[in-house]
Regions:
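Bacterial N-terminal signal peptides that target proteins for export
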Residues: 1-11
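Cleavable N-terminal signal peptides
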Residues: 10-12, 21-22
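N-terminal signal peptide c-region/cleavage motif recognized by signal peptidases
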Residues: 17-19
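Cleaved targeting-peptide boundary
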Residues: 23-31
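Extended, polar beta-sheet/loop recognition surfaces of beta-rich domains
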Residues: 31, 37-41, 45-52, 107-121
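Short, surface-exposed alpha-helix to beta-strand junction/turn motifs within ectodomains of secreted
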Residues: 47, 51-71
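A glycine-anchored, Pro-Gly-centered beta-turn/N-cap motif
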Residues: 87, 92-98
């Protein structure tokens, strides 16, 4: 029994303390605009920041209005390997939803939504 515990304890420790990046999915940690925010401009700069590297060429960001109609986005380059950026121009006042889907460097897909309202004067 002692021999069994002698080699399984270090093995379990290696498994449990393994590289967090190996098990990490790309989770959204910050967005601009943040969820349920009111934006006071007809131009909205979108930044989605994740907790790990993403495969930007295999990610999607879509914007829809309150009726679910797609709204054009201009994707922009980000220097950070964990961030997506886009700009929406000429938004009318109303509710909008950002729909994102990313492929993490670990090969897992995560997706989510961020809602915001435009109330510009």
């Amino acid at each position: 029994m002692t021999r069994f515990l002698g080699w399984t304890a270090p093995l379990a420790l290696v498994f449990l303390a393994g590289s967090p990046a190996a098990f990490a999915h790309a989770m959204l940690v910050r967005s601009s605009p943040s969820d349920q925010t009111v934006v006071r401009s007809h131009q909205v700069n979108i930044a989605l920041d994740y907790d790990s590297r993403i495969e930007t060429s295999r990610c999607t960001v879509k914007l829809t209005d309150a009726a679910g109609k797609p709204v054009p986005l201009q994707m922009e380059h980000s220097a950070k390997p964990s961030e997506l950026n886009a700009v929406a121009h000429g938004l009318a006042n109303g509710k909008y939803q950002i729909h994102w889907q990313v492929l993490a460097s670990d090969g897992h897909i995560t997706r989510g939504d961020v809602a915001f309202t435009v109330a510009a004067q």
